[in-house]
UniProtKB/Swiss-Prot annotation:
The gene is sepF. Belongs to the SepF family. InterPro entries: Cell_div_SepF, Cell_div_SepF/SepF-rel, SepF-like_sf. This is Cell division protein SepF. Residues 55-67, 101-120 have a biased composition (Polar residues). It comes from the Bacteria. GO terms for biological process: division septum assembly; FtsZ-dependent cytokinesis. Coiled coil: none annotated. Cell division protein that is part of the divisome complex and is recruited early to the Z-ring. Probably stimulates Z-ring formation, perhaps through the cross-linking of FtsZ protofilaments. Its function overlaps with FtsA. Gene3D superfamilies: SepF-like protein. Residues 30-40, 69-98 have a biased composition (Basic and acidic residues). It comes from Enterococcus faecalis (strain ATCC 700802 / V583). The lineage of its organism: Bacteria, Bacillati, Bacillota, Bacilli, Lactobacillales. Homodimer. Interacts with FtsZ. Pfam families: SepF. Keywords: Cell cycle, Cell division, Cytoplasm, Septation.
C-alpha cells in the first residue's frame, strides 16, 4: 500500500471527506460554467478619439462700400498737365490778342476809309467840257470818268457817225463804273461817275464854260 494515496494524505493533513467533495464539486462547477458560458468576445481596443480638427470657417470679408480710390497723378504727369494747361491759356490769350488786333486794324481801316470818303466828298466836284472831233478822243473822256470827274460832251464839231460811236463807247464806260450818261441838249451829253449827280438844267446853263466848280 502506497503512502501517497489520496486518503492517506487527507488523513495526514486533517482534511475530511466533505472537503474533498467540496473541491470535487467546485471543479465540476467550474467545468460546467466554462462549457455553458458563451465565449467572451475579444476585447476590442478602445477607439481613440480622433483629435478634432479645428474647423476653419471662412468668414466673408466685410466690404465697406466706399468711394473709388482715385490714383493721384504722378509728379511728371502733373507737370505735363500744368504745361499743357499753360500752353492752352497762352494760346487762348494769343488768339484773343490777335482777334483784338485784327478788330483794331479793321476799325482803323474803316475809319480811314470813312475819312477818305469824307475828304473826297469835301473836294470840289469838277465838270470838264470836251468837244471831240474824232473817235479817238473818246479815250480821253473815259480817263476823266475814271478820275471821278463829270464830263460834258459837245458833239457839234464831230461827224454824226463818229458821234454815235463815241456815245456807244461812253455808255459802256459809265456802265462799268456804275455811273450815268444822259442827253442834256441836241448834241450835248453829260457823263457822271457813281458818286456824282447833276441835273440837266445846270448842265445846259454851263455848256459854254470849259470848267465849272460847284
Amino acid at each position: 500500500m502506497s503512502i501517497f494515496n489520496k486518503d492517506a494524505l487527507s488523513s495526514f493533513f486533517g482534511l475530511s471527506g466533505e472537503e474533498d467533495d467540496y473541491y470535487d464539486n467546485y471543479e465540476e462547477y467550474e467545468e460546467r460554467k466554462a462549457v455553458n458560458e458563451p465565449p467572451r468576445r475579444a476585447a476590442r481596443p478602445k477607439p481613440q478619439r480622433p483629435v478634432q480638427q479645428q474647423e476653419s470657417y471662412s468668414q466673408p470679408a466685410y466690404t465697406q462700400q466706399s468711394e473709388p480710390v482715385v490714383e493721384k497723378p504722378s509728379a511728371r504727369y502733373r507737370s505735363a498737365e500744368a504745361h499743357q494747361e499753360r500752353d492752352t491759356q497762352q494760346a487762348a490769350y494769343t488768339e484773343k490778342k490777335v482777334v483784338s488786333m485784327r478788330s483794331s486794324n479793321q476799325s482803323a481801316t474803316t475809319n480811314t476809309r470813312r475819312a477818305q470818303e469824307s475828304t473826297a466828298n469835301a473836294k470840289t466836284h469838277k465838270i470838264t467840257i470836251i468837244e471831240p472831233r474824232v473817235y479817238s478822243e473818246a479815250m480821253s473822256i473815259a480817263k476823266h470818268l475814271f478820275a471821278e470827274e463829270a464830263v460834258l460832251v459837245n458833239f457839234t464839231l464831230v461827224e454824226e457817225d463818229q458821234a454815235r460811236r463815241i456815245v456807244d463807247f461812253l455808255t459802256g464806260t459809265v456802265y462799268a463804273l456804275d455811273g450815268d450818261i444822259q442827253r442834256v441838249g441836241n448834241e450835248i451829253f453829260l457823263c457822271t461817275p457813281a458818286n456824282m449827280e447833276i441835273d440837266s438844267a445846270t448842265a445846259q446853263s454851263l455848256a459854254n464854260k470849259q470848267f465849272f466848280d460847284f
